[in-house]
A protein has these predicted regions:
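Short amphipathic alpha-helix segments
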Residues: 12-29
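Conserved helicase motor core of SF1/SF2 NTP-dependent helicases
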Residues: 41, 103-231, 235-325
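Interdomain "pre-motor" coupling segment immediately N-terminal to P-loop NTPase/helicase cores
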Residues: 36-95
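Compact, well-ordered interaction domains used in eukaryotic information-processing assemblies
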Residues: 25, 31-34, 38-40
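Hydrophobic side chains in well-ordered alpha-helices
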Residues: 16, 23, 54-57, 242-245
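Short glycine-/aliphatic-rich beta-strand segments at the starts of folded cytosolic domains
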Residues: 1-15
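Intrinsically disordered, low-complexity linkers and terminal tails enriched in Pro/Gly
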Residues: 84-98, 315-325
Length: 325
């Protein structure tokens, strides 16, 4: 069966096909169809059902392209997932909605429905808890929202923090002064800020006290007013640390807590403050809880495959069918 889709502009076809036709090859492979660009039309040939699904995917990609989105492998795979679950109409929800402009002029915006719901919660609620696997953009989008709130003068400070003890290491055994000890743990936060502001602007705001990047222990005893506060890697907080952090909230401030509950480095006898907070605060007004999944992974496709493989392994192990720990 052959189906045809009209292409209004050559640039759209180029964007849809991708570099060396890699996008269209991926569609052909996933749906077992053949796609040809001829006389201003995309001609899709294959089994009737497969051709129909492929056309839906192409239409969704055209919608993204018409709104200025540069189509890449991640877009294609995400659209394929939406089409297969019958949710391709949701793609219209991802057009527009620029959250922030990076230092290099690149628009930062949600790339999946899960990310969009996460950002909606961040903008709406006083406290948002965002959990999900690596690569879902939890921290990066939170930093983008913080930078935009600062640019819009909604807050006077951006405060980024995370537990300083991870992966079995203890700061006292590491060489150097306190700053050199904690810097490696805070590097992902620095990277996100550099991307949004540029190194020079970041340094200027840091010296003025508009930006603070510090270990969680530095939050104790403070009340943080007019600030956008992000707690990253929150799965490694104890219940006491989490309660301490949440009660730092001051007037005119917003808190975003991010973490991955499958990557807890605490001793086995310690309760994760993040997991407990999700249970305790789920129905509290003004607090939003967003759970991202591997469908929201926007890094290299291998990251998504790795996340899925570990999820399958953990499920099998927990049911007594997996290998030894």
């Amino acid at each position: 069966m052959e189906q045809r889709i009209s292409i209004e502009r050559l640039e759209q076809a180029v964007n849809i096909f991708g570099s060396f036709d890699e996008n269209i090859r991926l569609l052909e492979q996933e749906f077992n169809v053949t796609v040809v660009n001829r006389d201003g039309e995309l001609r899709v040939e294959g089994d009737a059902e497969a051709a129909c699904l492929a056309c839906k995917a192409i239409q969704a990609l055209l919608t993204l392209s018409s709104r200025g989105e540069a189509i890449g492998e991640q877009n294609v795979r995400y659209v394929i997932g939406l089409v297969r679950s019958g949710k391709e109409e949701q793609i219209t929800e991802l057009t527009g909605d620029v959250l922030c402009i990076s230092a290099k002029g690149r628009p930062v915006k949600p790339k999946t429905i899960g990310q969009k719901e996460y950002i909606k919660s961040v903008l709406k609620n006083t406290v948002t808890i965002g959990v999900g696997p690596a690569g879902t953009g939890k921290t990066y989008l939170a930093v983008a929202a913080a930078v935009q709130a600062f640019r819009d003068k909604q807050v006077n400070r951006i405060i980024l923090t995370r537990p300083a003890v991870e992966a079995g290491e203890r700061l006292g055994f590491l060489p150097g002064d306190l700053q050199s000890k904690v810097d490696p743990y805070l590097r992902p936060l620095y990277d996100a800020l550099f991307d949004m502001l540029g190194a020079e602007t970041y340094q200027k705001y840091l010296e003025r006290g508009n930006i603070e990047v510090a270990p969680l222990a530095y939050m104790r005893g403070r009340t943080l007013d007019d600030s956008f506060i992000i707690l990253d890697e929150a799965q490694n907080t104890s219940r006491e640390q989490m309660k301490m952090f949440l009660t730092r909230l001051g007037f005119g401030s917003k808190i975003v807590i991010t973490g991955d509950t499958t990557q807890i480095d605490l001793p086995a006898d310690k309760t994760s403050g993040l997991k407990e907070a999700m249970r305790v605060l789920r129905d509290v007004e003004g607090i939003g809880i967003c759970e991202l999944t591997n469908a929201d992974v926007v890094r290299h496709v291998m990251v998504q495959r790795i996340v899925e493989a570990y999820e399958k392994y953990e499920t099998a192990r927990n049911s007594g069918k997996g290998g030894k720990r």
